[in-house]
């Protein structure tokens, strides 16, 4: 059984949390995030510690309790440190370019793919085959990185495509000739 909901969230220095009728706003050095949570979960702020309490031990309450705690912790970490996902491109002629806030990808198609950065997301290119997606919302960073990867996900025969750094791609044997 998971006990994530019972863990205490410690607010780092410079991070403020405001709770107005379970609409929580977290402000930090990197920005501000707001999210509405279930009215069933009580959010208590005592100094620099946040604790979450559920009214009963039903299965639904336990799931909401753990999820709320994880989302709230991600908000606190996001506004203080931020999140980033790194992607790498493998394939002949595969490269990325930045045009303002737009990411332009050449991934073996007849046309370049263009990805507009959502609000709060920045793209960085340490080299033409590495893409770093960063921002304060873990959810939006993950969705944006997954979308970029989906434009040319790694194929199992040669391994060409866009993958997360450190991702293992299962390879297949090709057809055997006569």
From Swiss-Prot:
Belongs to the universal ribosomal protein uL6 family. GO terms for cellular component: cytosolic large ribosomal subunit. It comes from Streptococcus pneumoniae serotype 4 (strain ATCC BAA-334 / TIGR4). Transmembrane segments: none annotated. This is Large ribosomal subunit protein uL6. InterPro entries: Ribosomal_uL6-like (IPR000702), Ribosomal_uL6-like_a/b-dom_sf (IPR036789), Ribosomal_uL6_a/b-dom (IPR020040), Ribosomal_uL6_bac-type (IPR019906), Ribosomal_uL6_CS (IPR002358). Keywords: Ribonucleoprotein, Ribosomal protein, RNA-binding, rRNA-binding. This protein binds to the 23S rRNA, and is important in its secondary structure. It is located near the subunit interface in the base of the L7/L12 stalk, and near the tRNA binding site of the peptidyltransferase center. One of its GO terms (biological process) is cytoplasmic translation. The gene is rplF. Part of the 50S ribosomal subunit. HAMAP family: Ribosomal_uL6_B. GO terms for molecular function: rRNA binding; structural constituent of ribosome. It comes from the Bacteria. It holds the Pfam family Ribosomal_L6.
């Amino acid at each position: 059984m998971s006990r994530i909901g019972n863990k205490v969230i410690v607010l780092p220095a410079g991070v403020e949390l405001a709770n107005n009728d379970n609409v929580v706003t977290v402000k930090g050095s990197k920005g501000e995030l707001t999210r509405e949570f279930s009215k069933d979960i009580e959010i208590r702020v005592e100094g620099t510690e946040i604790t979450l309490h559920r009214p009963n031990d039903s299965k639904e309450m336990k799931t909401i309790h753990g999820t709320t705690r994880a989302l709230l912790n991600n908000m606190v970490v996001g506004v203080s440190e931020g999140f980033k996902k790194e992607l790498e491109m493998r394939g002949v002629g595969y490269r990325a370019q930045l045009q303002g806030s737009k990411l332009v990808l050449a991934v073996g198609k007849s046309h370049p793919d263009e990805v507009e950065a959502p609000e709060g997301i920045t793209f960085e290119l340490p080299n033409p085959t590495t893409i770093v997606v960063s921002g304060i919302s873990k959810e939006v960073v993950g969705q944006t990185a997954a979308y970029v990867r989906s434009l040319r996900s790694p194929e199992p025969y040669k391994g060409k495509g866009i993958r997360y750094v450190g991702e293992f791609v299962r390879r297949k044997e090709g057809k055997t000739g006569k």
